[in-house]
Structure formats: structure tokens, C-alpha cells
């Protein structure tokens, strides 16, 4: 049981996921501190009345209490900064590398041979039109039969 768990943890996907979570958590903390220390104070100063310290995004509701929309706006900016960075620094490069790495796989030889057998059987049993190798069916492009029919 312990061996199976060790193999599960040693797989590449699990290790990659663990690294991504650690880096993502650290990056989130960095962006949150940036937003809290730089963006939020700038947003707090938008439309502030010098006498009451209540502005466009901080609405006084009486009794010295306010509805502070600055916190919500800061959280939204925080989210969009993280989403932007993750998309352009992780997702986009990963997708381009994955597309470059995709190589067209040659057809499975067993499938090619079975297709040729099916076509031969259809021809010997009578010309049936359609998928089963009738008169309108083109010659195979792969496999042993393709080289003999092209000669």
C-alpha cells in the first residue's frame, strides 16, 4: 500500500501540481501585498472629501459607519492581476509548447491491416457502395496494399 502511494506521488503530474500550488500561493501573496500597499491607498484617495474622509467609493451610512467599496475594488484588481499573470505567463506558453510538441502519430498498423482486410472482403463478396470498399472507395494510402495498388 505504501509503495503504491509512493508511486502515485512520484508521478510527474502530481509533482508538477504541487509545484504549481506552492508557486501560485507565493505569487498570490505577492500580488495581494502589492494591491494592499499600493493600489488600495490610491483607490482610497479617489473623490475623497477633505473634511469627512468620505468619497465616491466610501459611502457614509450614518452613525460614523461607512460602506467601503474600496475593499471590493481592490479584491477585483487583485484577482485580475493574478488571472492576467497566470494566463500570460503559464497558460499561453504551455499551449504554444504543447502545440509545437504535437507530432502527427502514424496510423496504428493493426487498424490499417483490419481496414484492408475489410475492403478485400467487401470486394470479393460483391461491390457494395459506401464505407465497405465499393467502387467509389479510394485505394488505401498506407499499408502493404497501398504499395501494390500504386504499381
Swiss-Prot record:
Other notes: E.coli inner membranes are often used to measure the activity of heterologously expressed channels, but the lipid composition of E.coli membranes differs considerably from that of M.tuberculosis. Phosphatidylinositol is one of the major constituents of M.tuberculosis membranes, but not of E.coli membranes, and this affects channel activity.
Quaternary structure, from the entry: Homopentamer.
PROSITE patterns: MSCL
PANTHER family xrefs: LARGE-CONDUCTANCE MECHANOSENSITIVE CHANNEL (PTHR30266:SF2), MECHANOSENSITIVE CHANNEL MSCL (PTHR30266)
Chief location bin: membrane
Molecular-function GO term, any one: gated channel activity
Entry keyword annotation includes Isomerase: no
Residue ranges crossing the lipid bilayer per the database entry: 15-43, 69-89
Residue spans, topological domain Cytoplasmic: 1-14, 90-151
GO cellular component, one term: plasma membrane
Family: Belongs to the MscL family.
Membrane topology, Extracellular segments: 44-68
Protein name: Large-conductance mechanosensitive channel
One of the GO biological process terms: monoatomic ion transport
InterPro entries cross-referenced by the UniProt entry: Mechanosensitive_channel_CS, MS_channel, MSC/AndL, MscL_channel
Name of the encoding gene: mscL
Source species, domain of life: Bacteria
Region of interest (Disordered), ranges: 122-151
Protein localization: Cell membrane
Keyword Cytoplasm part of the UniProt annotation: no
UniProt keyword terms in alphabetical order: Cell membrane, Ion channel, Ion transport, Membrane, Transmembrane, Transmembrane helix, Transport
Amino acid at each position: 500500500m505504501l509503495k503504491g502511494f509512493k508511486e502515485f506521488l512520484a508521478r510527474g503530474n502530481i509533482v508538477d501540481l504541487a509545484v504549481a500550488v506552492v508557486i501560485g500561493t507565493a505569487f498570490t501573496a505577492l500580488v495581494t501585498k502589492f494591491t494592499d500597499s499600493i493600489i488600495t491607498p490610491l483607490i482610497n484617495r479617489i473623490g475623497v472629501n477633505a473634511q469627512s474622509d468620505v468619497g465616491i467609493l466610501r459611502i457614509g451610512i450614518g452613525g460614523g459607519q461607512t460602506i467601503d467599496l474600496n475593499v471590493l475594488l481592490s479584491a477585483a484588481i487583485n484577482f485580475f492581476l493574478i488571472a492576467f499573470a497566470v494566463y500570460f505567463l503559464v497558460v499561453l506558453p504551455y499551449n504554444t509548447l504543447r502545440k509545437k510538441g504535437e507530432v502527427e502519430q502514424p496510423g496504428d498498423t493493426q487498424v490499417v491491416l483490419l481496414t484492408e482486410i475489410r475492403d478485400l472482403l467487401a470486394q470479393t463478396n460483391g461491390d457494395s457502395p459506401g464505407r465497405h470498399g465499393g467502387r467509389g472507395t479510394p485505394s488505401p494510402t498506407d499499408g502493404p496494399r497501398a504499395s501494390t495498388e500504386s504499381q
